[in-house]
Each structure stands twice: as structure tokens, then as C-alpha cells.
Amino acid sequence: MQWETVIGLEIHAQLATQSKIFSGSSTAFGAAPNTQASLVDLAMPGTLPVLNEEAVRMACLFGLAIDARIDRQNVFARKNYFYPDLPKGYQTSQMDHPIVGKGHLDITLEDGTTKRIGITRAHLEEDAGKSLHEDFQGMSGIDLNRAGTPLLEIVSEPDIRSAKEAVAYVKAIHALVRYLGICDGNMAEGSLRCDCNVSVRPKGQAEFGTRAEIKNVNSFRFIEKAINHEIQRQIELIEDGGKVVQETRLYDPNKDETRSMRGKEEANDYRYFPCPDLLPVVIEPEYLAKLREQLPELPVQKRERFESQYGLSAYDASVLSASREMADYFEKVQGICGDAKLAANWVMVELGSLLNKDGLEIEQSPVSAEQLGGMILRIKDNTISGKLAKMVFEAMANGEGSADQIIEAKGLKQVTDSGAIEKMLDEVLAANAEQVEQYRAADEAKRGKMFGFFVGQAMKASKGKANPQQVNELLKKKLEA
């Protein structure tokens, strides 16, 4: 039997506000436990929440960016459940009247095609605290620094059909919230977490299968692996005569498996009711109109502009627009050197390799956009060859100065004097007279391979400084003379 996978994702984006959603406590990451928890966060009797307007603004920005309906009046609700790191015994969230209604996001698949994923809703809520197990023998500690941190929960329609599509969607959301400046997207610190709802059904069947929810997956790689494992688990279970149970599961990256955590709750299990401590939030059309003017160029728009303005391929434009910082860096380099394709190649290949090796983000690059743009200018004006440029790039990454300073200090200036190159080539050919005779006696197919030998000898003799194009042209003339 052929199976179809159905996936819906719930992404929790931690909003980049300076203070919590209902209190004035700081949201800075990494503070000592319980140093950023106010009386409101501790749920002390008599304290009342005050809504953070910045969180509302950020949620509305997101809604505008996904072309969603934004409710003029939205209501906060209490989601009732007990957990040690939830001091109030309920979480303030939104249920029937979320701030952001139906919208959509287009994702680019591996084959270059575009797919539209529906977004059911996005609502504001507060995060819970954190249970700490490692440092307490036989006990658990509670850190309430995170309690009350504003979250935007983004719920997709069940439109996703594979683990790779799921990753593409999460990457698109990740890029979008970073472009908007509403979330730093740091998955390692928990700023962006994903719950994956996975089910399978026989191909052609309209009715959904029973879903399992994989909680709190925090990397693109783990999302793909967790979903693939869960798909396989469900198919094997059904084919062996079993039934999929609606439940919450956890992904264990060390064992590459999901395991049951608890039975999956439904909305009525949480006994939602409107929060009596918070008034409904009214969002006027004039407010949204002003916000719309603040929207930056979004990832899809930037990618399309890179293709049309700079003539980049769809793939290159997609990579370079993946983050706002990467796009800004590329445009600075291009603005200096005036060659978009050369700039794209150096940013994606050489710089990308350096950043990946050292685990750095583009904003932490040891080579500035000004330095890289200046170096590419020296390639264009034939001061250095592409091969020598790699040496210059490495030196810039090591903090040895600008391209011009390094070229001068290391004597890397390319030899472009035709007379000097001809003299050097004569010496190379004289030293390899036997190979010259073999070349002249060979057919075209063999000559192609042998020509590379002479080029290599010439570049070796010039210590890589001879202009490769001139070497090729002059060498061909001499060998065929």
C-alpha cells in the first residue's frame, strides 16, 4: 500500500521584546536563575498583568507579512493545566479570538518549485518557566526567568507532505521573523521551537489519519529526522495490524527515535475561558496602516529582486536572501566591486566555507564586506589572479589588513607584462622540450590534456603570479608555432 504523509507545524517564536509580555522583567538570555522574575511572574496574590504593547506590534507585523486577517478585537484566555514551572496554574494565551487569523507563506522546494502553505492562526501567549534536573540530586530546580516571556505561536494548516517540505517551511518562517526583527531565531537558545503534528493515510484517502505530536524540536536537522522516524513508525505500526494513538511524543536525537511522553490533550482538556484580568485588545485600521508602512523588504521580494536586478540564479538569490544580514553583506560587496556574480560566488563559496568551519554567523565574519569588495576589485583589474585571491582572502580572515596591504606586503601583484611572461614561457618550453615534441605530434584530444601540463609548469615557474589568461593565450601560440 502507498502512504501519504500529512504534517502540520506549530512554531513558537520568542518575541524580541526587552521586557516580558505581562510584566516589566527583562527577557535577556543567560541570566542567573530566578533573577529576572517579578511578583507578576511568580503569581503572587494581588498582582495584575499589564500587556506589553511591543508584543502586539510584533504580532501584527507578522500578520501583515503573511497577508493574514488581523482581528480588530482579540481576547486573551486562560489555558488551565498544572506543571511545576507554571506558577499561576494556568498559561495566559489566546483561543477563540487570536490576534492573527488565516494567512499563508510560500516556500521554495528542492526542485525550485514554489508551494503555498496555509497558516491557520498566530496567537500571543506567555512562556512557562524551566525545570532544571542536572544540578539537583534527587530533586528538580525551577528557574522562572523564562516565565512570562512573550511567544507568538504560529499554527500551519496540514498542507505539508514530507519532512523536507516541513524543514523548508520552518526555514521560511525563521527567515521571515528575523527579517521583521521580531525574533532572533536562535534555535539553540530556544527562541524558535517547533511542535510537529504527523499522521499518515492511504494515498487517495480524504480523511486524515490519527496524528502524533512531537514536542519542542529545536533544529532544522532534528525536525527532518524526527518527522521521518515518526512517519516510518506509524506506517510499520499500521501494517503490522496496530493503531496509531493520539499522543505527545519526544524526539531523542542520540537514539534517533521518538518516544511516548503522554496522551495528547484536546482544547477542552485545558478548560479555556477569557482572562478576567485583561481587557480585549482593539486594533484599529489606522494602526495597521502605519505598521504596513514599516514592513521591510521581505525574503521572497528580496530574492526576486536579486534575480531581476543582479541576474543571479534562483538558487544563488535564495541563498543570499536567506537572512537579512547575508543579503545586506552581499549588496555591500556588490556595491563596491560592481560585479554581482563574482560577489555572489565569493560570499557563498569562500566566505560561506570559512563561516561554516568556524561556526560563525555572517555578522561575525572576520572579513568585512568592504574588505571583500576591495579584494574582488583587484581580481577585476588583474592585480591578482583568482588563485592568489584565495591567499589574500585567507590573510584578511587572519586579520592581516586590507587586500591592497596584503598584496603589497606579500608581493602578490600579478605579472601582466607580456614580455616577461613570454620570456618565462620560453624557459618552461626549453626545459620540457620532449613534452613539446609529443604535444605537437599528438591529436586534438591528447593535446587538451597535455596543454594543462604546460600551464601548470608556467604557473609554478611564476609562483602563481602570471596572469592565467595571458599564459593560456601566449602558450597556445608558442606551442602551435
From Swiss-Prot:
Keywords: ATP-binding, Ligase, Nucleotide-binding, Protein biosynthesis. It comes from the Bacteria. GO terms for molecular function: asparaginyl-tRNA synthase (glutamine-hydrolyzing) activity; ATP binding; glutaminyl-tRNA synthase (glutamine-hydrolyzing) activity. It catalyses: L-glutamyl-tRNA(Gln) + L-glutamine + ATP + H2O = L-glutaminyl-tRNA(Gln) + L-glutamate + ADP + phosphate + H(+); L-aspartyl-tRNA(Asn) + L-glutamine + ATP + H2O = L-asparaginyl-tRNA(Asn) + L-glutamate + ADP + phosphate + 2 H(+). GO terms for biological process: glutaminyl-tRNAGln biosynthesis via transamidation; translation. Its EC number is 6.3.5.-. Allows the formation of correctly charged Asn-tRNA(Asn) or Gln-tRNA(Gln) through the transamidation of misacylated Asp-tRNA(Asn) or Glu-tRNA(Gln) in organisms which lack either or both of asparaginyl-tRNA or glutaminyl-tRNA synthetases. The reaction takes place in the presence of glutamine and ATP through an activated phospho-Asp-tRNA(Asn) or phospho-Glu-tRNA(Gln). This is Aspartyl/glutamyl-tRNA(Asn/Gln) amidotransferase subunit B. It comes from Pseudomonas aeruginosa (strain ATCC 15692 / DSM 22644 / CIP 104116 / JCM 14847 / LMG 12228 / 1C / PRS 101 / PAO1).
